[in-house]
Amino acid sequence: VPEDNYLNKISTPKVADAVAKNDMKAAWLAELADLNVCSQKGLVEMFDGSIGAGSVYMPFGGKYQLTETQSMVAKLPVAHGKCDTVTMMAYGFDPYLASWSPYHGAIYAVLESLSRIVTAGGDYKKIRFTFQEYFRRMNEDPKRWSQPFAALLGAYNAQIGFGLPSIGGKDSMSGTFNDIDVPPTLVSFAVDVAKEQDIITPELKAAGNELLYFTIDKDEYDVPVYAQVMKLYDAVHALIQKGAIVSAYALDGKGLAAALAKMAFGNKLGVTVDTDVTTDTLFAPGFGNIVAEVPAGKTAEVYEALHNAGLSANVKRAGAVNEEAAFICGDMKLAIDEALNAWTGTLEKVFPTRATEDKEEVKTDLYHADSVYVCKHKVARPTVFIPVFPGTNCEYDSAKAFERAGADTIVKVFKNLNAEDIRESVDEFTKAIDQAQIIMFPGGFSAGDEPEGSAKFFATAFRNAKMTEAVMKLLNERDGLALGICNG
C-alpha cells in the first residue's frame, strides 16, 4: 500500500490544518462545511419525497427534519390488505478513494452500500448488488485499461468475500473530454428486503443514551477482513432487532465527527465525545465502521453480544447524547446552531431551503366553514371512480384510503395502444363516472408529463364530449365531488 494511504489520513485540507493547530472547533466547523459533508437538503427537496404512501421514512429525519438518511425504504405495493415487507436500497462510492486506488475504491463502495443497509436494520445476508461503472475512454495506451480491471477485481473480491452477488449493472467507458477524465467510478447499489418493524432511523433519540463505536478489521493490504465484518454486522443486526440499538450511522470517507453531527441535527440533541477518541477517528475515513445509539440500560447487553461473537476489541464507547444542544469534545464546546449554520451554509445560496426571508404569517381561511353542506343525494356507501392513465402512480394508495374510510372504488386504466382501445376506454370511463358520487384524479406523471407540463393527457382525455358530459352531470345534477392529488 503506498505511503500516502488515503484510508489513514484526514482528507480535507482545512480540517487537517485545524487539527495540526490543535483547534478542535475549527476542525469540526471545516468538516461540516466541506462540500462532501454539507447539507444538500435544498437539492433533495427538488425531488418529491412525499408522493405515495409506501415510503417508510423521509429523506431527512427527526423533529427538525435535518438528519439525512443513508438509505431508502419502501413498502411493497399491494392492491388489498396490509403489507409489512419493505424493500431497502443504499449506495456506496467515494471518488477520492477510487482515484487513489480503483481496487480499494470498488471494495469499499460495496462495503459502504452494505453497511448502510445494516444501520437501517437490514440483514446483509439477503442483499443483492447492482454496479454502475463509468471510466475514462480506453485507447491504445495499455495503462488506461488498468482502472476498469482493478475496479472490477476489487468488486469481485468483495462479492466473493461477502458471498453476495451483483446481479445487474451498467458500464460506460466514454468518460473523457479532451484531456479531462472522470475518476474511475464503480458505484455499488445494495438492495435488500426486511420487515417494517425492524427498520430504524439515524437521528439521535434521547439524551442520556450512550454512543458505541463498532470498527472493522483490515489486513495488511487495507482490505476488509470479511469474516470479521460479517460477524460484526450479524451482531449489530441482532441488537437492532432486540431494541438495544435505537439509531445507527455507517461511516464513510469522513470520520466520526461528521456522523455524530448528522445524527444530532435531526432532534437538536448534543453529543459529548469521550476524551480517548482520537482526531484520526473523528476526521479520517471510517468506511465500514458504525456508530450506534444505545439506551443507557442496554450497553451491557451490547458488550456481551460482541464478547460472545469474539469481537470485544471491535467496540468501544465513543460518547453520550447530552441535553446541552452542543458538541463537547475535550475543551471544545460547539453550539449545535453554530454547527448547523456551517453545515447548511455551504449550499444554501445554490440550493436554497427557504423560499423567502419574509416571516409574515400566511393566513389560510380556506377551511373555515360556518355551516356544513350535506349532499342531497344520499347513499349508504359512496362510490369513487379513480381514472388511471399511463404514468400515474398513486391509484393504489388513493383507492386504499377511500376503502378505509368506507367507500367503494372503481379503478379503470385508460388504454391508448390504438384507436379501438381509446374508444373502449372512453365508454368505460363514462359508465364509471355515471355510477360514482366522487371522481378522484391520482398523481404521478401522466404520459411522462408531456407535452410541456403535467396532466396534459388527463385534460385531453376528459375533453371528450361523452366524458365531459358525464363529469358535468356528476357535479351539477348529482351533487358529486371531484378532487385530485399531484398530477390530478
Regions found by a protein language model. Give the residues of each.
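Cysteine-nucleophile active-site neighborhood
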Residues: S446-G488
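Glycine/proline-enriched, intrinsically flexible loops and inter-domain linkers
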Residues: V1-I438, P442-A447, A461-M472
